[in-house]
Amino acid sequence: MLTPLLNSAVYYLVFGILFQQNRGIYHYTAYLVTGVFIFSFTERSIVTGSTVMRANIALIRALHFPRACLPLAYVMVEFQQLLVSMLVLFPIVLITGEPLTWYWLFLVPVLMLQATFNMGAALIMARLGAGAQDFSQLIPFLTRIWRYFCGVMYSIASLPASLPEWAKNVLSFNPAAVYISLTRNAIMYSQREYAPGAQPYNALKCAIFNTKKIPQLQAYCHPIVTTNQLWLAGIGWAVVTLVAGVLYFWQAETRYGRG
């Protein structure tokens, strides 16, 4: 829990103050910490999944049990850590000025979907890590790059208008960005009130937002991804990744622990 908080502090100094990414985002501290905590859950699940089979090679060789229990157990440990971190996140969100509303209940299905996605991703990483010793050393580098494409420290909606629409869609629909956005929509009223599409489309006001970064005017822009699309994407990523992970991991069930 301390590492995500320290990362949040560094990102706030670099992106919030130095690069002024806090412009156009109400309650940037809550926005940033939410993104860091949610992404860290997926990041740790994937990184741990890539090392779990080799780290437990002696146990695998000594006992007969479903090998999938190992990566899944580690994801559950990370999920417990996330729940503990929520005890820190909630006060931060409230202190910054966000109200406690019934929308917070949506956090439950969001976290369940993310945990499901993480399980599938961990199973895939577990098989890849078991087959290639150096693979697990590459994963932290890749997840670090992934972090910068998920809108953790900035708003994807406020990216320059010159950026192609397809590129914004790719950023918005990547799984980590989807679960981060759903979480922010659940616990941050300002994200629902001032997100693109919250108000009827107004080209002039939207254009002013793109140059002046005025949060209220952001609501008058066309949404990159609607709330319904976010939920469909979140469900889709969770189901597809879990099924793919189970099948991919199970195909090598008898080979784990050899060599």
For the regions a protein language model found, what residue spans apply to each?
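Hydrophobic transmembrane alpha-helices and immediately adjacent juxtamembrane helices
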Residues: M1-G259
